[in-house]
Amino acid sequence: EMCIRDRKVAIVGYTGAGKTTMVNLLMRFYELWSGQIKIDGVPVSEMRRSDVHAMFGMVLQDTWLFDGTYRENIAYGKPGVTDEQVEAACKLVGLDHYIKTLPKGYDTELNDRSSLSAGQRQLLTIARAMVENAPMIILDEATSSVDTRTEVLVQKAMDRLARGRTSFVIAHRLSTIRDADLILVMDKGDIVESGTHEQLLGKGGLYKELYTSQFENK
């Protein structure tokens, strides 16, 4: 049993280890076979799925955009959001200047075929999550498809998004989660190690193997 309120929790492991399944269980896309996940002391199995989903903001590796303006894309699913809130979120993630150089600024049309880089798409999704202002955040593989320079920008934006919230981070690049309050190491669907970055390196187990292999391959 563990309590993770207002903490940054990283979930790591090789491909197929069960990281995404863990996130799906948190959000009740899947049902638990045993055990419980509680939010504010209430088992998620006793909550409506829509209520569980509303508690999470998500930043995914495969970001999606719909036909509409930048403003509409960022304010998606949040009635009553003001222009000021949208622009404030974009300033925090570093998108405001770029959007204001466009012909119609925030009212420029945007769709899934727009020539945005992978990093810009992720920054837009982070701005969307900031506007959504959910108490918990899931960052799923959020820096695996961007170059190192863009990764720094995305990482700073994610850190701002996660501040003051409970956050769950799944990342291929373990350098991005060294500051996590808790790291869960998964293998074949089970949590096999847990602790901080320093604690897990000291154990010399699977986490150290994962971490070391990334730097050996550079």
Where are these regions (language model features)?
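Extracellular interaction modules
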Residues: 1
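ABC-type nucleotide-binding domain
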Residues: 4-218
